Amino acid sequence: MEWEAPALVLSASPYGESSAIVHLLTEDLGLVHGLARGGTARANRALWQPGNLIRASWRGRLPDQLGNLSGELVHGSAARLMSAPLALAMLASACAVADGTLPEREPHPRIFHLLTRFFSLLSLDPDMAGWGGMAALLRWEACLLGDLGYGMDLSACAVTGGSAELAWVSPRTGRAVSDAAAGEWRPRLLRLPPLFLDESDPGTVQDWRDGLRLTGHFLARDAFGQRHRPLPPARLRLVDMIDALQPGALHPDD
């Protein structure tokens, strides 16, 4: 059996003397694994960097076997972000989250297309990490949770049924709550940044912190928790990086 398709590199781990076990995300096959012979050799190492879009070729005897991978670079995101630490951290976090939550060989075309678009935007303008990149990443995490069956319901207030002034999310149910209805439960709720409700809103540094805490709660409890795994180190490093940012450092409206 063999196939060829555009694919995003999510991870590559050394195997043997010079090969690598590579995890890819494709539109039609979802998450797939393969053996890239010579993948850690100097001549091939750059191809298998997480975040790269490649034209992948997979060959194996059976679909569920670890087949042999080869590929050609279509768009190299990772190398373009080396001088932009925040953008690189965002890319690494997204790759690790997708790699750790998506089931193998289950198509998630929306997640593939959103992630491909996000990486392309980051690499075309790494500085956009402070002008909407974080908001795009957080919205992608929310979409991922939805596709995996753990989505939040941000359409209306769980208490009143209204759609105005939604400002909180129940950590138990994932349903939105308006600021007026939060009442004495406010300290127990997760803040809902406006960027989840308005795709034109890039958010502030505090919004990013609140957003990472919001999606991180459901990623940790549901997407990773159901697999008995912790949040990946790359996601935790991104949280630390955003926590260390000073208000106004990246966005004029902070």
From Swiss-Prot:
GO BP: DNA recombination; double-strand break repair
Keyword DNA damage tagged: yes
Residue ranges of coiled coil: none
Family: Belongs to the RecO family.
HAMAP family xrefs: RecO
PANTHER family xref list: DNA REPAIR PROTEIN RECO (PTHR33991:SF1)
Cited function: Involved in DNA repair and RecF pathway recombination.
Record's protein name: DNA repair protein RecO
